[in-house]
Amino acid sequence: MDGDTLLDQVERAERALVDASRRSVRTDGDRPDTQERTVQDDFDAIIAAEQKIEPRDWMPDAYRRTLIRQIAQHAHSEIIGMQPEGNWISRAPSLKRKAILLAKVQDEAGHGLYLYAAAETLGIGRDELVAMLLEGRQKYSSIFNYPTLTWADIGAIGWLVDGAAIVNQVPLCRCSYGPYARAMIRICKEESFHQRQGFEILFTLSHGTPGQRDMAQDAVNRWWYPSLAMFGPPDADSTHSEQSMAWGIKRFGNDDLRQRFVDMCVPQAEVLGLTLPDDGLRWDADRDRYAFTPPDFDELARVIRGDGPCNRQRLAHRRRAQDEGAWVREAAAAHAAKRSGGTP
Ligand code: FAQ
């Protein structure tokens, strides 16, 4: 739709969410009176009516497990995702840039917290989720296993990584699980600002000295393919897409979203005056979309398995932060217990 920005889509999803909460769900269906309704029938009716499943509702175990996996992976990504950018907080080129970056990294901590809270509504504790991350039993996004070598990488992360995140996450604002959908609306509004700040960093560099321009181009060259890989394996190799789409958790396949991202980035790269590192990139008039060279999915598989450039460093840092923060969590629990008159 012309002029339909990602933020317009988020606002539409927000309105749909409010409307859905006002409609009552018909759970009687066409079933004859003689046949007893099952909780599965009610669940199916809610999904078919595009209503939201709420924590109090019955849901199939596999639906619950899929949500826990995806929401936890998403939460872990936000928290681990603070590391590559955190690397540049003390080296930002001006006080203003530093303040903006600090605020962005704090937003990511906030996103992690909304998401852990959404996962907790499914009956699993945050401690348990964090333990699963640290023991390597849950994943986080492949993208955060790449290093941030120059200041331009902060621009490339904002433009490309937040850009990919928002293309992937806007449809999640219409996810069938209410707490996740509501968290995503808030997150997407903030991600949109993040993407613009990344674009602005790159725009400044690409219109600066030749050295700054080269630095911006080099960052885009390194972050382009890892960003395309963020959308996951091709649909044919995606384990969960089909079922997740049937449940209204995912709304689109990985390849479709990857294509939307490419179509969004090409004109933006032109405005930046930077090139995307793909000789195969060209307008395909028959499909009304850009043709592009896909990412190296073997590399994605290696990074997911733990063999990317920074996997070990990221997890070691997270483990250290968890250990060093233990006293803060204990003190907070003791303080809360004291205020409520109990023991921790
Ligand atoms: N990295 O069957 P599918 C952000 C795994 S937040 C690692 O297609 P699904 C904000 C997948 O888990 C970025 N693993 O899976 C920010 C599955 O493994 P399993 C995070 C990946 O779930 C910006 C297997 O491969 N966003 O960037 C990846 O249907 C800047 C088969 O894949 C989200 O988490 C990958 N890239 O689709 C923060 C969004 N791709 O569990 C800081 C929510 C796939 O069977 C700075 N998540 N895998 O062993 C989703 O939309 C989906 O989970 C997908 C994957 C699309 C990521």
Model-derived regions, located:
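Extreme N-terminal leader/anchor segments
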Residues: M1-Y63, L95, A326-P344
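Extended, helix-rich structural scaffolds rather than catalytic motifs
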Residues: D2-S21, D214-P344
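Conserved alpha-helical segments that form or flank metal/cofactor-binding pockets of metalloenzymes
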Residues: R22-Q40, K104-M132, F199-L202
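Acidic/His metal-coordination segments adjacent to aromatic residues that form catalytic metal sites
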Residues: K52-A72, M132-G158, C175, G208-Q212, ...
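Helix-loop segments that flank and shape redox-cofactor active sites
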Residues: D57-Y63, G81-A103, A165-Y180
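Alpha-helical scaffold segments that form or flank carboxylate-/histidine-based iron centers
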Residues: Y63-H74, A92-H111, I154, P179-E191, ...
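Internal, conserved structured core segments that host functional sites
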Residues: Y146-Q197
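Glycine- and acidic-residue-rich phosphate-binding/metal-coordinating active-site segment common to enzymes
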Residues: C175-P226
